[in-house]
């Protein structure tokens, strides 16, 4: 699993389930602009939402193997301020777990927020 809110690539179905399972709880809602097939073995969704009062947009590409199992997920969020917030919230939730390494700490997210506000 790759994405703009991640600081690395999370591998395996267990990681995908844990990360996506919590990520879904952060959305106030999801307004889908497009959902559909992407090539022979893919799926794409484009949606907007709000997380803790901040607007966020996302384009997600999911790839499947011949058996229909997910082999790759790439999720790209925007704008940058919302990406930093999302990664921070995920990092706080997964603190102390093996998934924490994939997200920004509170301090790192705050430092980046300050840098983009300059």
Label the model's feature ranges.
Residues 1-41:
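A solvent-exposed, acidic/Ser-Thr-rich amphipathic alpha-helical stretch
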Residues 24-118:
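A beta-strand edge to alpha-helix "cap/lid" segment located at domain peripheries
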């Amino acid at each position: 699993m790759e994405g703009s809110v991640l600081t690395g690539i999370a591998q395996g179905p267990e990681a995908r389930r844990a990360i996506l399972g919590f990520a879904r709880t952060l959305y106030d809602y999801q307004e889908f602009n497009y959902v559909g097939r992407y090539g022979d073995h893919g799926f794409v969704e484009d949606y907007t939402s709000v997380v803790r009062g901040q607007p966020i947009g996302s384009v997600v590409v999911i790839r499947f193997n011949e058996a229909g199992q997910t082999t790759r997920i790439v999720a790209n969020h925007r704008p940058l301020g919302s990406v930093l917030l999302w990664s921070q919230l995920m990092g706080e939730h997964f603190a102390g777990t093996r998934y924490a390494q994939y997200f920004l700490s509170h301090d790192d997210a705050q430092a980046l927020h300050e840098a983009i506000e300059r």
